[in-house]
Each structure stands twice: as C-alpha cells, then as structure tokens.
C-alpha cells in the first residue's frame, strides 16, 4: 500500500490508521502563524461507522488504501440480508441491508450498484446518484401557486418523503438525487 504525506490527504481517500480503515470525510489544511502546517481530518470508520478527528502534520506518513470497486446487481432480500450478483462473474453474495445506510429505500429490483471491497470484505455500497421514483401521495396542483419558489411534501413509492415543486402531481414519475434526497426533475 502506498504511503502519502499528511498534507496529501483528500476527502474520499481511504486510510489505514490505528489498525482500522477510515474514509476521509472532511479535510482542512491549516497553516498557523507559529509552527508547522497540518491537515485536520474528519474520518469515518468503514467497518463500524464511528467518527474520528485527527491531525496530521505535513511530514506524517499514512497508508492510503485502494478499494476494489465491483458492479453488483440486486436480486432479492432475505432475513435482513441483500443478495447481489456480480455482473462479471455471476457469483452471488449476501450483504447486510445496513451497508446502504439511508439510501436503502432507493434500492430497486435489478438495480446495479457499486460495492467497494477491501481484501474480499465489502465495506461500502452506493446506489446510483439519480433514481426514478413514483409519487404516491401529494397535494393536488393549485393554479397560481407557481409565482413563488415554493415546494410541497410528497411521499414516494419507496416511503421516502421529498419536497417537490407545486406543478408535480400524484402518480407522476420523478428523478430523485440519492445523495441529497431531493427532487431533481420529472422523469
């Protein structure tokens, strides 16, 4: 594994630190008037989700880990486990449902997601950034409400609540940004 200097850490980097695997969430490079520069790094443990704030000097060496990314197709759910098929080898694997976190409701039958592996251990899974969903409940369209930049609540077919523009009605298909959990556009 390559070692990098403390000032080379960027958000999204995966580091091996204190015997664990950590993803750099936020990195602030600080140059105090007195003393050497350092990077203040907010990290999240990829195995248990705990957070840690750590300070790395420019001269500190830290191991950067490369995760292997594989496309996996969702097949079905059983006993709190999600069953996926590798799109290249057609091998099936079971992953815990909590690996997707709050993006779990956006997982649809047959959807291809990206799973990150480290030494054959699944550490992270991400659904596509934009997913098409159907609105099952929202207030009816009222003419004349489009003058102001206003939004109304809507419940999607997966149970997620999002704010949508007033011109979007019930039973319409919309595209939702899964990172921000916000309405993106009509489908």
From Swiss-Prot:
Pathway the protein contributes to:
Protein biosynthesis; polypeptide chain elongation
**What is any Pfam family matched here?**
EFP
The biological process GO terms on file are: peptide biosynthetic process
Any one Gene Ontology cellular component term annotated for this protein: cytoplasm
Subcellular localization(s) per the UniProt record: Cytoplasm
Return the SMART domains for the record. EFP, Elong-fact-P_C
Which PROSITE patterns does this UniProt record tie to the protein?
EFP
Q: Which residues are connected by disulfide bridges in this protein?
A: none
InterPro entries given in the database record: Elong-fact-P_C (IPR015365), NA-bd_OB-fold (IPR012340), Rib_uL2_dom2 (IPR014722), Transl_elong_fac_P/YeiP (IPR020599), Transl_elong_KOW-like (IPR013185), Transl_elong_P/YeiP_cen (IPR001059), Transl_elong_P/YeiP_CS (IPR013852), Transl_elongation_fac_P (IPR011768)
Which is one GO molecular function term here?
A: translation elongation factor activity
Could you tell me the keywords of this UniProt record? Cytoplasm, Elongation factor, Protein biosynthesis
Q: Which domain of life is it from?
A: Bacteria
Record-linked CDD domains: S1_EF-P_repeat_1, S1_EF-P_repeat_2
Give the matching NCBIfam families.
Answer: efp (TIGR00038), PRK00529.1 (NF001810)
Question: What family is it from?
Answer: Belongs to the elongation factor P family.
The protein's matches in PANTHER family, at most eight in alphabetical order, are given as: ELONGATION FACTOR P, TRANSLATION ELONGATION FACTOR KOW-LIKE DOMAIN-CONTAINING PROTEIN
User: What is the documented function of this protein?
Assistant: Involved in peptide bond synthesis. Stimulates efficient translation and peptide-bond synthesis on native or reconstituted 70S ribosomes in vitro. Probably functions indirectly by altering the affinity of the ribosome for aminoacyl-tRNA, thus increasing their reactivity as acceptors for peptidyl transferase.
Name the UniProt record assigns to this protein: Elongation factor P
Organism, as annotated = Ruegeria sp. (strain TM1040) (Silicibacter sp.)
């Amino acid at each position: 594994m390559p070692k990098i200097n403390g000032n080379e850490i960027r958000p999204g980097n995966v580091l091996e630190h204190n015997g664990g695997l950590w993803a750099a969430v936020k990195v602030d490079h600080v140059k105090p008037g007195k003393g050497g520069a350092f990077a203040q790094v907010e990290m999240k443990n990829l195995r248990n989700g705990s957070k840690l704030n750590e300070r790395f000097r420019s001269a500190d060496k830290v191991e950067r880990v490369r995760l292997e990314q594989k496309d996996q197709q969702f097949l079905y759910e059983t006993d709190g486990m999600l069953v996926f098929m590798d799109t290249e080898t057609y091998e099936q694997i079971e992953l815990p449902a909590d690996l997707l976190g709050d993006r779990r409701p956006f997982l649809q039958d047959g959807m291809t997601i990206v799973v990150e592996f480290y030494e054959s251990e699944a550490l992270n899974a991400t659904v596509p950034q934009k997913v098409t969903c159907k609105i099952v409940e929202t207030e009816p369209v009222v003419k004349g409400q489009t003058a102001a930049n206003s939004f109304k609540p809507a419940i999607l077919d997966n149970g997620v609540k999002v704010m949508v523009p007033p011109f979007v009605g019930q039973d319409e298909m919309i595209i939702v940004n899964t990172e921000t959990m916000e309405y993106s556009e009509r489908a």
